[in-house]
Amino acid sequence: MFLIRLSRHNPSSFTLLTRRLHDQTISSSRLRDLYNFQSPPPLSSSASENPDFNQKNNNKKKPKPQYRPPSSLEGVKTVHSDLPFDFRFSYTESCSNVRPIGLREPKYSPFGPDRLDREWTGVCAPAVNPKVESVDGVEDPKLEEKRRKVREKIQGASLTEAERKFLVELCQRNKTKRQVNLGRDGLTHNMLNDVYNHWKHAEAVRVKCLGVPTLDMKNVIFHLEDKTFGQVVSKHSGTLVLYRGRNYDPKKRPKIPLMLWKPHEPVYPRLIKTTIDGLSIDETKAMRKKGLAVPALTKLAKNGYYGSLVPMVRDAFLVSELVRIDCLGLERKDYKKIGAKLRDLVPCILVTFDKEQVVIWRGKDYKPPKEDDEYSSFIHRESSIDSDVDLSCSRGAQDSPDETT
């Protein structure tokens, strides 16, 4: 700005100033030639030649990459699981003996597309490849033996009575809040992951069972021990204490792929037929009308404990051929499951589900069943799954709801 103003006011002085600046630059270049002055090398070349400088730069923290939202276009790595059993949505409420007659949806895997190396058949993801040439190869006979060996390895030596009481005491409601809730869907596949997460921080976890699965607690205990390789050390009504085992290592827990959604249940044969076997149409109608008029044996509460329902029905069949159970307020699929379980456990014949009632018939040639046999797989103990009177009754009575009659 100063030079511009000077050139406007006095152009002669501006020319003199430029000549002086030019003479100074010439003199400085002459001094450089006279004294052999050399400028220092640039910083970039010294940094590349100095190894200590490069090492310091490498030790610096690398910048964090920018966040990229997940996209369905990116490939997902397929998960492999070595668990020796078929993956189902519910292990306690699904029966592998009854074959479905149809599917309500295409065979989309609930684990997600290409996320699991097992094929989804519409009902389960079998541990062995279902596409085999021979019929004998559909089910691997060594799976049960493999599960038994894995469980024995994890459990180690059996617990003493003092150790069992100590674990039960630690799992009371006044001691810990760790609990796994088991509802109308029973033992689901994702619930296995919840059990293993609790086993990271504690040796045992409390399992609270309510609703339809409590009708057959032996089935619940069997599948809990079979699928988690644990041990049920206490049972008080619908409250169980599941122990992880002496040799359990949380760092070596099995890989459990999670289900992303609940698959639709397949279509099974009808529970109530048009006519009851051995009776005519008129006799069937008369029996259904008579069954709805019979006094109710009990009224089931929603999300209650139904563990004493089977012996109640067996005792009622000693004096009456028809039994009615009031299920008012329960969902239709719930009391249908109750009827299906009673048919297999009592055993009996289903008559009707009308008016939210479960009416069952003992049959023509009824014989009182014998005492229940224990499951032949993993439940070999006599007293470990019984209720602990001193601990569970005093501290766990408030933890289990009473049955509404």
Curated annotation (Swiss-Prot):
Record key words, sorted: Mitochondrion, mRNA processing, mRNA splicing, Repeat, Ribonucleoprotein, RNA-binding, Transit peptide
Cross-referenced Gene3D superfamilies: YhbY-like
GO terms under biological process: embryo development ending in seed dormancy; Group II intron splicing; mitochondrial cytochrome c oxidase assembly; mitochondrial respiratory chain complex I assembly; mRNA processing
Family annotation (Pfam families): CRS1_YhbY
Chain residue ranges for the region called Disordered: 32-75, 384-405
Top-rank taxon, per record: Eukaryota
Any GO molecular function: RNA binding
Keyword Ribosomal protein (UniProt): no
Family annotation (PROSITE patterns): CRM
Subunit description: Part of large ribonucleo-protein complexes that include group IIB introns.
Function text: May be involved in the splicing of group IIB introns in mitochondria.
Protein name: CRS2-associated factor 1, mitochondrial
